[in-house]
Regions:
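Electrostatic interaction modules used in gene-expression and signaling proteins
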Residues: 1-126
Length: 126
């Protein structure tokens, strides 16, 4: 029997679409390399994202703004996705600011970002 889920392991709800921590971690494997253990909860992901944001050159002010505009968990998902795509994102801080602006306007959901990363990995059927 599986252990009961802790409160902080519930899927993040955005625009009626839920995204699970497991899906985020399946898509965004890189973030797991920056923890001394495993990411087992949203709290773990948020703490790891807070650490990684500095390595990406994202200022503390930009991070706090993103957390305020998106919510802590969504901001952490955004960092995990940005980390996964560092080779294609020239300015991680600017990118996060743009996402935070969209969130403030109510037009951002992390689901499409996560799915785009997953779909990019899928082999194309011939």
């Amino acid at each position: 029997q599986a252990p009961p889920k802790r409160q902080d392991e519930k899927p993040v709800q955005h625009h009626s679409a839920a995204i699970s921590l497991g899906l985020v971690l399946t898509a965004c494997k890189e973030i797991g390399l920056y923890t001394d253990g495993q990411i087992r909860s949203w709290r773990d992901l948020c703490a790891t994202a807070s650490f990684v944001r500095g390595m990406l050159g994202i200022s503390a002010d930009t991070w706090k703004e993103a957390e305020a505009d998106m919510g802590e968990e969504t901001a952490a998902i955004a960092i995990a996705c940005i980390l996964e795509r560092t080779e294609t994102i020239r300015s991680p801080g600017g990118y996060l600011r743009a996402l935070a602006q969209k969130a403030r306007a109510g037009s951002f959901s992390p689901g499409p970002m996560v799915m785009a990363i997953l779909n990019a990995r899928e082999p194309v059927a011939a």
